[in-house]
Design a protein with these regions (language model features):
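Electrostatically charged, flexible surface regions
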Residues: 157-282
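A cross-family phosphate/adenosyl-ligand binding-site feature
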Residues: 17, 21, 35-94, 100
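Bacterial N-terminal signal peptides
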Residues: 1-11
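Boundary at the C-terminal end of the N-terminal hydrophobic targeting segment
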Residues: 13-15
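Conserved acidic residues
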Residues: 103-104
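Alpha-helix C-terminal capping segments
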Residues: 94-99, 126-137
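Glycine-rich phosphate/pyrophosphate-binding loops
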Residues: 132-156
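Charged helix-capping and loop-helix junction motifs
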Residues: 120-126
């Protein structure tokens, strides 16, 4: 069953032709976020080539594998890459899709928000940066996690994936979402808090903490800083308030100064809550 969870106030977007998409992520090609996004993109009529890491590569940024990468075809335009998200994008554009280049690279949907200074280490965002560096428009998308759900598998995030994916599938039809020299970084709140879209500046803070704890003998892990601090209008704060945040990023990771590209058209999108409820089924 198809779900259209948004209505863009111009008819141009939904009337636009389907796109040829390179879909990737940093959680791995079988992760629930990318699988939900692939299903939504196909249902929206787009042509999708899923080219993503075979294993979780979270935190890899734009790093690449210098010793070469292997890839496996799984049929139905799905390939897994023994490398990082940037490897997958480079391999996709330069080799797998060489004769059928993508109109856009879509990266996500990440299991966890990519806001503030954490975009620097994000493989999800790094894949979008890599695409734009190679001259292909891109968009990155992530779904919020509630740290209180850590012991139960983050069910709110799992139910966010389907409706967020359907929204991305419609949003990218609008050519205004496909920028040159920069890209949109989207973060989706969990459904219960959903208020709509909001253009945001990149927060100066990071979720990543430097408070390391020993989790096993000789193995240390840093925790997370869940308090966003006092940063009004930042992506981190607005996401916590229930907005789908939109941040325009340059390919050297600097936030594009606001006001920049007019993104008010995205803020004017209305979301049908009944369609969101109907789509909120974990994949």
């Amino acid at each position: 069953m198809a779900f259209c969870v948004l209505t863009i106030l111009t008819n141009m977007a939904l009337a636009a032709p389907p796109l040829n998409i390179l879909l990737t992520n940093d959680d791995g090609y079988l992760a629930p976020g990318i699988q939900a996004l692939r299903a939504a993109l196909l249902e929206a009529g787009h042509s999708v080539s899923l080219i993503a890491p075979v294993t979780n590569q979270s935190g890899s940024g734009t790093s690449i594998t210098t010793e070469g990468v292997a890839y496996t075809s799984h049929g139905n335009q799905v390939w897994s890459v023994a490398g990082r998200p940037a490897d997958a994008v480079r391999l996709g554009i330069g080799h797998i899709m060489q004769d059928n280049p993508p109109d856009i690279v879509v990266s996500g949907i990440n299991f966890g928000q990519n806001v503030g200074q954490d975009v620097i280490v994000s493989g999800t965002v790094g894949a979008a940066v890599t695409a734009v560096q190679l001259g292909v428009p891109a968009i990155s998308a992530s779904a919020e996690i509630n740290f209180d759900e850590a012991n139960t598998g983050f069910p709110s995030t799992l139910t966010t994936f389907p409706w967020a994916a359907a929204l991305v599938a419609d949003l990218i039809r609008d050519p205004r979402a496909r920028l040159e020299g920069s890209f949109l970084n989207l973060n989706f709140p969990t459904q219960k808090k959903l208020k709509g879209f909001k253009q945001a500046r990149l927060a100066a803070s990071s979720i990543l903490s430097i408070d390391f704890k020993e989790i096993d003998q000789g193995l240390w892990r840093a925790g997370y800083e869940t308090d966003p601090g006092d940063e009004p209008d930042s992506d981190r704060t607005l996401l916590g308030e229930g907005y789908i945040t939109i941040t325009q990023l340059g390919i050297s990771y600097e936030p594009v100064a606001l006001p920049s590209t007019d993104l008010s058209w995205i803020e004017s999108i209305t979301i049908d809550p009944k369609a969101v409820d109907a789509a909120s089924v974990a994949p």
